[in-house]
């Protein structure tokens, strides 16, 4: 997308210079593409994944259909959405304003529908929108999981990991995890300017698959401490490294520090995005950002609680950013 083709208000904003990885080149482990993948995880923890080949068309068709379906779901009255079966932090509904927002002292400006992969596979406590469209949600979750696992396999190969040291051993499909489909809606916020965006953070898990066709996502630049917008691109999704992969890689990979902040600090239109969070098996052990012994489930619970803490407490601890804010000297 050229600057002239951007929305007028974003025409002159600074954008992140992220690598693009071609997914088809990873199937046969193209050496040059593996090298670029490793470099992307080491340097930025964020990259574009090109999915424009004919083989990816089913993925895009499903994504556009599920995007339309969940947009309709978000149009329901809040009273109806609050009745969504919520059985864990990874499965259910999150209302606007439950967490700290992207501007200090303000709350977040998004609501979310969370569909845990374990719950989806087990047909457990599924909201009607999922039950009524089960083949669609099944197929889309499977596609996202496949993409994530192939990337993980390539990262293990790129680091020449063997046996139990390979990242896939911590992501077995027969073990429970907090892997989740995540549908986000940022409603127009002019009526409540105290609820804005999504706070600076790193993701909890291993890899995030993100479809964000509208502007608003920012990443932190370690080069000069500036926040840069991530440009939406056609036929490409965004992938970012989460805390667990950073810890499992001995902090060789960076978990990307990011946030969602509309220009001017007010969301002027409905904004939607779709994520799939690949997370390690609950029992996966590692040393966290404070070098304390932890596991994937404990880190998930600890970090999710931190999302809801006031900014003043978040600043005092490493949990919100997995230690990246302290390492990069990032501020709200």
UniProtKB/Swiss-Prot annotation:
GO terms for molecular function: dioxygenase activity; metal ion binding. It is an enzyme of class 1 (oxidoreductase). Binds 1 Fe(2+) ion per subunit. Fe cation binds at residues 201, 203, 258. 2-oxoglutarate binds at residue 271. The keyword RNA-binding does not apply. Induction: Highly expressed under trichothecene-producing conditions. Its EC number is 1.14.-.-. PANTHER family: 2-OXOGLUTARATE (2OG) AND FE(II)-DEPENDENT OXYGENASE SUPERFAMILY PROTEIN-RELATED. 2-oxoglutarate-dependent dioxygenase; part of the gene cluster that mediates the biosynthesis of butenolide, a mycotoxin that shows antibiotic activity but does not seem to play a major role in the spread of head blight in wheat. Butenolide is derived from glutamic acid via a 4-acetamido-2-butenoic acid intermediate. This is 2-oxoglutarate-dependent dioxygenase FG08081. It comes from Gibberella zeae (strain ATCC MYA-4620 / CBS 123657 / FGSC 9075 / NRRL 31084 / PH-1).
